Curated annotation (Swiss-Prot):
Assembly, per entry: Homodimer.
Binding positions (S-adenosyl-L-methionine): Y35, G61, C62, S63, D86, N87, D112, I113, R194
Coiled-coil zones: none
Protein name: Carboxy-S-adenosyl-L-methionine synthase
Gene3D superfamilies (alphabetical): Vaccinia Virus protein VP39 (3.40.50.150)
GO biological process terms, semicolon-separated: tRNA wobble uridine modification
Gene that encodes it: cmoA
């Protein structure tokens, strides 16, 4: 279904409810530059860091489940345990419907990623999710994810990022709005979504994200991909 959510007046704070879930796949593809490529890279590196057989993969803020279903499709004999976690039942109902259609064994669980008890895993994925976690809790979550990874495990996540330079940041935002116009969003929709996400989506700079990861204990942090103010990072835990 096409995303026309912000052509109407929203009567409450933005949340991932039934209305958003119904258009979410279209919203992602038209609102996040190279979103499909970020997922493809995530699947590539997730599979490369799994053992020959088995292993655990979590996707936090899994929304409609597309990434885990793609990893499962490509995993073959590796046959990892794939678990998606989201706090939105509306999103998960769509993920489960997709899984049923594909005959998938991916587990989709409703829960709070801050409180969830994770099994030791090789891979944790977290795309455009940390930016919705309040800064006061964000470092705690990253530390918890680090502690949940096995030695040499990886965390792959994507975030909207801000520039340390005010002028450059403004230019980057304007280029992003131009992208949204190219995708068919109107000026009214762009303004309404910006207002809806204010104080809900709180991005860090790339350096702030890297600092948070290193302070949690990750041995290596790399930028896998970046387009203007959207970035995909990979962080690797050291050996035991």
């Amino acid at each position: 279904m096409r995303d026309e959510l912000f052509t109407e007046e929203l009567k409450k704070q933005f949340e991932f409810d039934e209305r958003v879930a119904g258009v979410f796949d279209d919203m992602l593809s038209r609102s996040i530059p190279y979103y499909a490529l970020a997922l493809e890279l995530s699947a590539d590196f997730a599979l490369a860091n799994l053992p020959k057989e088995g292993g655990w993969v979590y996707d936090l803020g899994c929304s409609t489940g597309s990434l885990l279903l793609e990893i499962e499709r490509r995993a073959g004999a590796k046959n990892p345990r794939l678990i998606g976690i989201d706090n939105s039942e509306a999103m998960l109902s769509r993920a489960r419907a997709k899984a049923l259609g594909y005959g998938s064994r991916v587990d989709f669980i409703q829960g709070d990623i801050l409180d969830f008890e994770y099994q030791k895993s090789e891979v944790i994925l977290c795309h455009y999710t940390l930016q919705f976690i309040r800064p006061i809790h964000r470092a705690y979550l990253v530390q918890k994810l680090y502690d949940s990874l096995k030695p040499e495990g990886i965390l792959i996540f994507s975030e909207k990022v801000v520039s340390e330079d005010r002028v450059l940041d403004h230019q980057m935002i304007e280029r992003y709005y131009a992208y949204k116009r190219e995708q068919g969003y109107s000026e009214v929709e762009i303004v309404k979504k910006r207002e809806a996400l204010e104080n809900v989506l709180i991005p860090y700079t790339a350096k702030e994200n890297e600092k948070m990861l290193l302070e949690a204990g990750f041995a290596h942090v790399e930028t896998l991909f970046r387009w203007v103010n959207f970035a995909t990072f990979i962080a690797k835990k050291g050996e035991a």
